[in-house]
Amino acid sequence: MAEENLELSLLCTESNVDDEGMIVDETPIEISIPQMGFSQSESEEIIMEMVEKEKQHLPSDDYIKRLRSGDLDLNVGRRDALNWIWKACEVHQFGPLCFCLAMNYLDRFLSVHDLPSGKGWILQLLAVACLSLAAKIEETEVPMLIDLQVGDPQFVFEAKSVQRMELLVLNKLKWRLRAITPCSYIRYFLRKMSKCDQEPSNTLISRSLQVIASTTKGIDFLEFRPSEVAAAVALSVSGELQRVHFDNSSFSPLFSLLQKERVKKIGEMIESDGSDLCSQTPNGVLEVSACCFSFKTHDSSSSYTHLS
């Protein structure tokens, strides 16, 4: 009953609403919590534990079946929501990790909660709420909710409406916002791709994050685990996709938990999406992703093979 009341209380206002009174105790938030920051000294056991727990941060099993079965409202709604989140990330110069978190929240929510059909404003409100939550987790500076809503949307929502939707999302996700995404693993896998287990360069990490954000919007990637996607991206970007050798003694025991053919399939899907992924990535992603973390750079002596 409480959940029904919460849903019924969601309000929507047209885009010409008066700003007066819309913001309730809302000021820009500054948070510094890196979502992907594994140091070289962190143990294999921690990463392997993440692999074991990553399923807790995925959409329900029947979600991709519903998307593939031709559920038009769900497909179109998801696409429009992700397109808006992408544009908002571009405008606010949020990094690809923020986009991936927002997408994760959106998919997990839609997989367990049916929204009423024919009410596009609810999906728009959901998109705003998911991006707001992701930004609070990942970004160091978060705009006020009214300022977050960019791109000339059909609807602009009061802060209290977004906050109510945020609460509904939090309840449905069981408050698990520190989601494990492909971004969570990418630095680790890139390091394992190097010849000397060296720290990857900012450039290589940025490029990998671009590929993750650019490609995983497609529904076909939902059938794969975040660790599998991260491994495939690391292999692809480092030029090792065609030489997948998980049994190599220099590789981590973690690779024994991955299915070689599934990882290779993801890599082929990524490469088939085209070579202009970076040009499709939101403006500012390179700058934001490079400065979000304190990486050691080894550009001058990198032993990685960069794709041209």
From Swiss-Prot:
Q: Which UniProt keywords apply?
A: Cell cycle, Cell division, Cyclin
Expression is induced as follows: By sucrose.
Instruction: Note whether Cell division occurs among the keywords.
Output: yes
Please give one Pfam family short name.
Answer: Cyclin_N
The tissues in which it is expressed are:
Expressed in shoot apical meristem, leaf primordia vascular tissues and tapetum of anthers.
Cell cycle listed as a keyword = yes
Gene Ontology biological-process entries: cell division
The record's comment on protein family reads: Belongs to the cyclin family. Cyclin D subfamily.
| Quaternary structure, from the entry | Interacts with CDKA-1, CDKB2-1, KRP4/ICK7, KRP5/ICK3, KRP6/ICK4 and KRP7/ICK5.
Q: What does this protein do?
A: May activate cell cycle in the root apical meristem (RAM) and promote embryonic root (radicle) protrusion.
What protein is this chain from?
Cyclin-D4-1
Q: Which organism is it from?
A: Arabidopsis thaliana
